[in-house]
Amino acid sequence: WETTDAAKEQILWGLAHADVVKISDEEVEFLWGITDEKEAAKKLLDEFGIRLAMITMGPKGAYLANQNGAAYAKCPEVKPIDTTGAGDIFGGSAVSRLLKAGKAPEEFSTEELGFIGQFACTAASISTTQSGGIPSIPEEAAVLDRM
């Protein structure tokens, strides 16, 4: 983007057309100056009509929320080597669990949101222990074993 205003405009357009959103705490602060993940999730759900908001907070974990509830997920402690792709791996891992469940995003319970978040946080954390983005994507069994 040529300017930060242009970036914000395009990101906000994308949010207005999304059902499931994975967004980082840094991106939330950039867009709205919000530093509280609960407030950010509420904004996404209520003002943008997002059906499932996933706010990632780096090594601190993630906060997942829909209209049924919300859950925090903690990341396992690791010694990171390369964080390239960790956010993408979180998003892809979360979406894999959503698709496996075969439910609408707003139908997940607080417990299910917690499991999805924990799975995605674990996958992202494992990925940081290796170099590279794609080569560091862990297998499902490795993620489940680490949980």
Task: Put a short name on every predicted segment.
Residues 35-147:
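Conserved phosphate-binding/catalytic region of the ribokinase-like
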Residues 1-43, 51, 60:
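Conserved beta-alpha-beta core of the PfkB/ribokinase-like small-molecule kinase fold
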